[in-house]
Amino acid sequence: MKKFLTIAAVAFAAFATVSCDKENGTENGGEDNKPETKKVLLHLASELTEEAEFLYGRSFEYDENGKLSAVKEVGDWGSYNLTVTWNGNKVTFTEDNGDVAYEWTLNEKGYVVAKGDYTYEYDAEGHLTKIVEDWGEGPYVASIITWENGNMTSWSKEGEAEDGSGNARVKRQTYKTDLNKGGIFTAFTEKSSLKKWMFELGFFGVASKNLVASDKWDDRENGADFEYRTDADGYVVAEVKYWEGAIDDETYYIWK
């Protein structure tokens, strides 16, 4: 890779000592006898390996009750900080200059049900299933997300088929047998107006049970494939995306 921010380089150095069996997700003899471990996400960093390279690192801080209190991002372009405040069923992200970046309304399970012009619906298991947009001309369904055996199997861009038919454009996922212990979101609906970390901190429902193997549009011949490295407890520390056999981007995670 051509360039790393210091924090991403440190993260990668920590990950480099960890290896896993790509077939079963276990490390040197398996995890069957290991106690269950619960961790929170402290940091993620990502690098696109295309010509227009972009690298960022984002860290998360929590208060004494385990609630998110701050999000700090650093990139080649500078830094960006958000302070997180909780008030009943509202959570607000405020920039250093006092501007409100995000204000969300939560349901009784702590999942976001409203954000600006978007509303979000979930099934009984806590999976995000529908996104509705309303830009002032009445609500319309923007995305339908389907689930099977605890895994997201497809998400749609409703009415956006590239053939002009007005049908949905659909992206489908396949899965490995490896468990998704950290609840990462390798694949998520792009119609959500959300970022990867917002899903991975648990604000938008339950993640897929297993790790994503592939991700492909119905109207495309090729899609993306994914491989992972995990720590000793089975949490993903590196997610590698391949496009047509070449590395497209990599995401690194630090857990505690």
PLM region spans:
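Positively charged n-region of N-terminal signal peptides that target proteins for export
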Residues: 1-4, 21-22
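Sec-dependent signal peptide hydrophobic core
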Residues: 5-12
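C-terminal motif of bacterial Sec signal peptides marking the signal peptidase cleavage site
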Residues: 16-19
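Buried hydrophobic residues that stabilize the cores of well-folded domains
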Residues: 22-256
